[in-house]
């Protein structure tokens, strides 16, 4: 009964909350019904307080809908208490089990193993510039760092190159090491895991390899997509993954795409990547780009005016590395020529980059092209009209903007009369689905791609 009731609550919350919100705060909760008290267990105090503050009334309403006047009281606890109670039960149940399995988490963590954390001290949460495009990822990363093995395990961050995924991995490592000096952390690119495994096989040392990776407290792997088509490495990582999760050892992975979109990786691995929390990092919106430029300039002992920062941010939208590269060029030119950094100076220093940017497809261009194709007005696309003759072209334009530009979901939403980023995400998913089911939609999509790419 308790499981059934909690599942009904979860189903309602999943229907009524945005996906990212549900994944971030609700999915990690556990619950049981005890003497008409619904005990809800959160992975840590931060999540507990947040859920209590933001969702308690929502939960009460759902329980009242299902149970009427006999709806249970709600009590919040930290997940650790739940695990300890469960562990006591398991010990009692398995006390006479002589065939008890040996799991890797029970193996002593030998002191003579040397762990190379490879954590770069330059990257931390303090110098990570937060904005709408990355705030969920940053918050989840910080929680995982403060409660390794208990919050969001595994944590999977994905997004295009240069958006801060690697920065967050280093920040997690540095945060953990700041309060747990003796913790064993491995930070590496997935290709290093493959190379280590190949060396272990050549040297007949595969058991040492297994012990090395399965005895860590936190495993941070960057660019997991490079496991594609490496069957033996995937096999070994599959078992390592299972062992670490079973031992409550933290796993954090990054990729340039959503887990299910990683080609050449086994389905069973892709499924496990999504066991915990999966969060996208989008290209930064203009306010975040401006903040990044000013912060990076300050780190170089350069005072950058808001006007110049806005000028650069307006023309360079794709990723943080591109912004840093442009800023470094402006600073270098200023130092060589001994000229002040003004908008005109920045325009001159970046003239070749700006020339390339002008050829890039814009949201404005997409809106005009889509409106012309469907024989409607741009103002209709931006309006609140919901008729299919307007809503479908609007969704198509949003999907085009996501595919053909480097704008973040919030920025695309802003360009469509301030719509929420979840509306844009829904539009992209809807068009993707319709392209598979509806020949006319597929044809429209391809025709618009060709027109915009000329």
UniProtKB/Swiss-Prot annotation:
Keyword flag Coiled coil: no
Q: Where is this region: Domain III, AAA+ region?
A: 118-334
One GO cellular component term, please give it. plasma membrane
Residues the record lists as binding ATP: 162, 164-166
Give the family per the record.
Answer: Belongs to the DnaA family.
Instruction: State the oligomer form and interacting partners.
Output: Oligomerizes as a right-handed, spiral filament on DNA at oriC.
Q: What is this protein called?
A: Chromosomal replication initiator protein DnaA
Q: In which organism is this protein found?
A: Buchnera aphidicola subsp. Acyrthosiphon pisum (strain APS)
Phylogenetic lineage: Bacteria, Pseudomonadati, Pseudomonadota, Gammaproteobacteria, Enterobacterales
Query: Quick one: which gene encodes this?
Result: dnaA
């Amino acid at each position: 009964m308790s499981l059934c009731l909690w599942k009904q609550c979860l189903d309602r919350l999943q229907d009524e909350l945005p996906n990212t919100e549900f994944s971030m705060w609700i999915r990690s909760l556990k619950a049981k019904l005890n003497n008409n008290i619904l005990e809800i267990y959160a992975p840590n105090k931060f999540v507990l307080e947040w859920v209590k503050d933001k969702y308690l009334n929502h939960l009460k309403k759902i329980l009242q809908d299902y149970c009427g006047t006999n709806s249970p009281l709600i009590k919040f606890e930290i997940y650790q208490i739940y695990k300890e109670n469960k562990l006591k039960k398991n010990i009692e149940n398995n006390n006479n089990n002589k065939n008890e399995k040996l799991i890797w988490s029970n193996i002593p963590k030998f002191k003579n193993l040397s762990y190379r954390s490879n954590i770069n001290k330059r990257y931390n949460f303090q110098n990570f510039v937060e904005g709408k495009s990355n705030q969920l990822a940053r918050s989840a990363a910080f929680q995982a760092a403060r409660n390794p093995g208990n919050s969001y395990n595994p944590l999977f961050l994905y997004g295009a190159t240069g958006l801060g995924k690697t920065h967050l991995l280093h920040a997690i490592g540095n945060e953990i090491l700041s309060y747990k000096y003796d913790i064993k952390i491995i930070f590496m690119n997935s290709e290093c895991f493959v190379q280590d495994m190949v060396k272990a096989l050549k040297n007949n040392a595969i058991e040492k390899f297994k012990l090395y990776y399965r005895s860590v407290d936190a495993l941070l792997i960057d660019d997991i997509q490079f496991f594609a088509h490496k069957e033996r490495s995937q096999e070994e990582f599959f078992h390592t993954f299972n062992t670490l999760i079973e031992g409550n050892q933290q796993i954090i992975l990054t990729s340039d795409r959503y887990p299910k979109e990683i080609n050449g990786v086994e389905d069973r691995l892709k499924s496990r990547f999504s066991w915990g929390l999966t969060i996208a990092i989008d290209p930064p919106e203009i306010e975040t780009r401006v903040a990044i430029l000013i912060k990076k300039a300050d780190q170089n002992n350069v005072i950058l005016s808001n006007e110049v920062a806005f000028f650069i941010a307006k023309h360079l939208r794709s990723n943080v590395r591109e912004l840093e590269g442009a800023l470094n060029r402006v600073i270098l030119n200023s130092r060589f020529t001994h000229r002040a950094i003004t908008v005109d100076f920045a325009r001159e220093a970046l003239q070749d980059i700006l020339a390339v940017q002008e050829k890039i497809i814009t949201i404005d261009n997409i809106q005009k092209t889509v409106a012309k194709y469907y024989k409607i007005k741009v103002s209709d696309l931006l309006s609140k009209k919901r008729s299919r003759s307007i809503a479908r072209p609007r969704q198509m334009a949003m999907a085009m903007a996501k595919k053909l530009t480097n704008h973040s979901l919030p920025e695309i939403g802003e360009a469509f009369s301030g719509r929420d980023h979840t509306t844009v995400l829904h539009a992209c998913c809807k068009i993707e689905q319709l392209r598979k089911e509806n020949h006319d939609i597929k044809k429209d999509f391809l025709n618009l791609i060709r027109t915009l790419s000329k």
